[in-house]
C-alpha cells in the first residue's frame, strides 16, 4: 500500500468558491417519535455540537399524531370533522426549544381521509391520495392557521413546505401515479398560498432511479400550469443496491462522480425552463445508503465519504439535509442493537458516530465570518476575518488500499512568530465506537457501564502544537477526518516558568 504525499500552499489572495450549508436542515424519524425521551436526548446532543436550523420528517398527518378526526354522531349519524393539535404542539414546542424550525413535509394521508388502504413501514403510514381533495386542503389550511396563531405568523411563514415524499416510488405514493401527484401538488400549493402567500412551497421530493424523468415532467407541469413553485426538492443517496443478509443490507459506495452526476442533471433540467432558471434546489434527504439497516452508516468510512459530500453539495444546491440525526427510527421496526446500521448521526445510547463529527467539523468552519482559501479532494480550508485558519481534512476510500495514507504538508503564510495548532482527529484507531462494541462481543443490550465506555470511545482525539514557520503536517490514514485550527499565538510565560525544563524531568 503506497503513501501519498501532497503539498498545499495557502494563498490568502485567492478566494475559493465554497457554499457551506451544513447546518440548514437535518432529517428525523416520523414526527411522533419526538414524544420519546431518548429521541430528545439524542437531539440535544446533536444541537449542542452541531446546531441545525431546520428539521424535516415524515408523519405530520399520520394517525399517531391524531390531527385529523372524523366522528359520527351515534344518534343522528351526522359526521363531524375535528382537528386535534395536542401532540403536534408538543412536538413543535420541543423543536423550537432546541433552536429548530420545521421544514414541513405534507404527508402521509390520515386513514379516515384516504382513498385506499396501502401503507408503508412498520408504523403504517397511508400512502394513497385523499378521497376528498377539499378535505385535504382544509386539513393543511387549518394546521397552518393553528401554527400561525400559536407561534406567530411572521415566524411560521418562514418554514419551508414540501408536498409529500418520494412519489416516484409506488410504496410511497399509490402506483407512483405521476398525474395524481401533480394534482396533489397543485391543490396543496394553492391551499397553502391561500393562507399566506409568503409561504414557500416546493416538490416533488423524488429519490433516485426515475428522478430525471420525474423532475423533468414536474418542471414541464408547473411551467404549463404557470405555478410559481418556490423551490425544487429531491433526495440524494450514493450506494448501489444492498445485499440483504439477516437483519442487514450491505451496500457498495458509488464513485464521487457517479454520486454527483444526477444532481447536475437536476440543475440543468430546472434551468432549461427560463422562468425557473436559478430556482433553489433543496436536497431534503441525503446519506450514503438509503436503507436504515446498512452497517456502513456506523463506520469511519461513512464519515470520510460524507466529508467529501459536504465539501461539494453546496455547489448548486441551496441545502442538503442528512437523513437522519438519530437512531430512534422505526421504518423497519425497532432495531435489535445499538449498531444496526441506522441512518442517524447518533447511535442509541447517545453514542456519537464518526459521521457526527464530520458535521460538527464543517459547522465549525462557519462559526466565524470567513472566506474559503483552499478546497480540493482532501480538504477545505477557510480563513476567518480575525485571522484564524480552520480546515477539515479527509481521506475517504471505497475499498481498502485504494489510496493508503495521505500525508498533507500545509504551508500557511507566516505573519507572526508562532501559531497555535489544535487538531481533532476521527479515524479507525482514535474514534471508532463500532470497533469497541465489536470488541465487547457486540452486546445487543449494553449495560450502563458499557454504554459509558462506548460514549468515551466516540470522541475525537485532541492534538496540539506550536508552529513557528507556518508549516503543518497532517497524516490521514484511510477514512480519516481531521479538523484543524491555526491561530497566532504569543507565549506569555509567568516569571521563571520554563516548559521545556519541566518536560526534561530533572
Indicate where each model-derived feature is located.
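Substrate-binding cleft and catalytic face of glycoside hydrolase catalytic domains
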Residues: 50-254, 291
